[in-house]
Amino acid sequence: MSTNQYDVLVLGAGASGLMTAYMAAQRGRKVVVVEKANKVGKKILMSGGGKCNFTNLYVEPSNFISHNPHFVISALTRYTNWDFIGMVCEYGIEYEERKHGQLFTLKGAKEILAMLLSECEKTGLVDIKTNCEVKAITALDEQGFQIATTLGYFEAESVVIASGGLSIPTLGGSGIGYEIAKQFGHHVYPTRAGLVPFTFSDSFKEVTTRLSGNAVDATLSNDLNSFTEALLFTHRGLSGPSSLQLSNYWDVGQSFKIDFLPTVDLHDYLKAKKHSQPKALLRTLLGEHFPKSVVVE
């Protein structure tokens, strides 16, 4: 079986894989991107509800969770959010700013994927192979690696793991990247869920089930961090941006607090209402801030 020769093999054709391929090709490297799914960029297309939250106006190293903060600083210095925004503007992709500086396309995530593929194509040095699953990687005696795939063998001087995490297996998520990293002596930290809802099995679940579909602004906090955004009640527990963000700083068995009136000093508020509306019922006052079903509960 013949072997295909490349300078760089990128494992995974998601956002990071396509950006890596484009950047390597800009430096004159011949690149092949291998993707086990039948299409590239599936997670890009579903991100942001199909509108792709492609970056943020306020990108700081402190926003990133990493065991190697120095790498985060270096990466964000060498390629900034404004560099990517500039590329988006060059392609005439319209976007909007939402809460907390989040940027979303107006016409859909397909525009971001098309942009990345176009940048790769313009270099003339990037090949993309779909339905191509990596089976084994072997270090060569002289230099580089041999990669066995379902489409044959490849050789490359460098291999980049951009296969993503374990989430959403139906979109191609798998543990192959972790296995390869371990194989070549890299330390792999234990994995755990992140950006996930909180689920409950006790009596509180009965409450969230009854309130399912209601959303309120709230602050969720623990000893490590706090987030003030929308909180969504579901039939299994709590979701919404505030829950998803705090889940990155929470582990099983730990507690967290919920402030349902983060912008209100409750003592001063009730004191003022006592004078302005002395006969008002508590549920009436709470109704100024929460949906009726939440107040009743």
Give each language-model segment a name:
Residues 38-40, 45-46, 55-61, 187-190, ...:
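An anion/pyrophosphate-binding glycine-rich loop and adjacent beta-alpha core
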Residues 130-143:
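A conserved short coil-to-beta-strand element within the FAD-binding core of flavoproteins
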Residues 72-80, 99-118, 129, 168-172, ...:
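Short beta-strand to alpha-helix junction loop
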Residues 49-99:
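Glycine-rich active-site loop/strand segments that organize a redox cofactor
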Residues 9-11, 34, 134, 153-170, ...:
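Short hydrophobic core segments
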Residues 25-49:
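Glycine-rich FAD pyrophosphate-binding loop
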Residues 158-201:
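Glycine-rich loop(s) and the adjacent beta-strand/alpha-helix scaffold that form part
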Residues 6-33:
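N-terminal Rossmann-like FAD-binding beta1-loop-alpha1 element of flavoenzymes
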